[in-house]
A protein has these predicted regions:
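Adenine nucleotide-associated cytosolic modules
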Residues: 1-292
Length: 292
């Protein structure tokens, strides 16, 4: 079966038969099964990644279908959780993939055991409080993770290798307040796809053990205006970083530092959890990195 299903991928020299076997033994945690997460799950399943753990609290809605893979009107009508619908679709695409679905809000207590049990974490979220939580857990447990974000025609991604690269905290000192979401600014599907192709390519390199082939940049683009920047990040690493510095405190593993309000992208819904007001823009990251 391996030689038939993955024959074209095996022909790609950096993968080959040995690499394909590594992918089939690999395990990935995908936090968020919305726009980014659903595309990533689809690609990883087709690539033959052996085990995936999917975390998402949301349900499939009709407005999701414009930009999210895996889901259908039948899932909307049945009011299926995204994690459940994603698992069902993946098993149709590639029955050999082992899927664990978790319909739950991601917090430190329930994410930590999942992080400990996988090879890599992929960010499919739509809010920065969860991303900073992933960042803390990934660095604490020395697990590589791949950040991704998109809005409108913009997108960005960063690969974090604990102990080697700067982490997300090095680039952003505080959690951004989500002043704009896809509910207010909109989003086009190609922007989602552009982020995910970079995320999944980096993920495959890591799972193959080919970290020397990683991009090692913060990638930022605006598809609509034909703009792209790939900025070196090596100088962004901070000795006093609260997550990856010399004396880490992992602040987002502490309840009082977790953001309390989430706008659920694609739904007229706000989830309120206990407070912290902060500010951020993607342009701010780009400006900071280009000044280093």
């Amino acid at each position: 079966m391996m030689h038939t299903r993955y024959s074209r991928q095996i022909l790609f020299a950096p993968i080959g038969e040995a690499g394909q076997k590594k992918l089939m033994r690999a395990s990935v945690l995908i936090v968020g099964a919305g726009a980014l997460g659903s595309w990533a799950i689809d690609m990883l399943a087709r690539a033959g990644v052996g085990k995936m753990k999917i975390v998402d609290r949301d349900y499939v809605e009709e407005s999701n279908l414009q930009r999210q893979q895996l889901y259908s009107m039948k899932d909307v009508e049945q009011k299926l959780p995204k994690a459940v619908a994603a698992k069902a679709r993946v098993l149709q695409i590639n029955p050999s993939v082992e899927i664990e679905e978790y319909v739950m809000h991601a917090d430190a207590s329930n994410l930590e055991p999942l992080v400990q049990s996988v090879d890599l974490i992929l960010d499919g979220t739509d809010n920065f409080d969860t991303r900073f939580l992933i960042n803390d857990l990934a660095v604490l447990h020395k697990k590589p993770w791949i950040f991704g974000a998109c809005l409108g025609s913009y997108g960005s991604t960063l690969t974090v290798i604990p102990g080697v690269t700067p982490c997300l905290q090095c680039l952003i000192r505080s959690v951004p307040m989500q002043t704009m979401t896809c509910d207010s600014m909109g989003i086009i599907s190609p922007a989602v796809g552009q982020v995910v192709v970079h995320q999944v390519t980096e993920a495959i390199k890591i799972l193959l053990g080919q970290t020397d082939a990683l991009r090692n940049t913060y990638l930022y683009f605006d598809l609509w205006n034909h703009e792209q920047m790939s900025i070196k990040i090596s100088k962004a690493k901070m000795e006093d970083c609260v997550t990856c510095g010399t004396v880490p405190t992992y602040p987002f593993l502490q309840f009082e530092n977790q953001t309390k309000t989430s706008v659920l992208c694609g739904r007229d819904t706000v989830q309120i959890r206990p407070p912290q007001a902060l500010s951020f823009s993607t342009e701010e990251i780009v400006k900071r990195l280009t000044e280093l």
